[in-house]
Amino acid sequence: MAAETAKHVRVSADIQMLGTELLLYESMNGFFPPTNQGLQALVTEPTVEPRPQRWYQLTKEVPKDPWGNDYVYRSPGLKNVNGYDLFSTGPDRQPDTADDIWANDR
């Protein structure tokens, strides 16, 4: 039980950090990275459209969730159509299921 709680705390911290970096990206460029660029746009400059006018590396690497999976990022989001969706698929490793972990709505 404590291990699962620790994993949930880590997911919340990771999503908060990534959320801050996404807001910086958006403030510099006027848009969040689209789904096809994903969170990798925070690490390496996108080479596909829409390309940011003012790109800076905002993180050295995108963390994996505590279960070893990539965080799910969608922009525009399905849940947050004016922003983005960012969540962990949780222990079942399947998106859009009951055990997904969302830290904040963006």
Annotate the PLM regions.
Residues Q16, T20-R106:
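Low-complexity, acidic interaction segments enriched in glycine
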Residues M1-A13:
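Amphipathic alpha-helical segments typified by the pilin-like N-terminal helix
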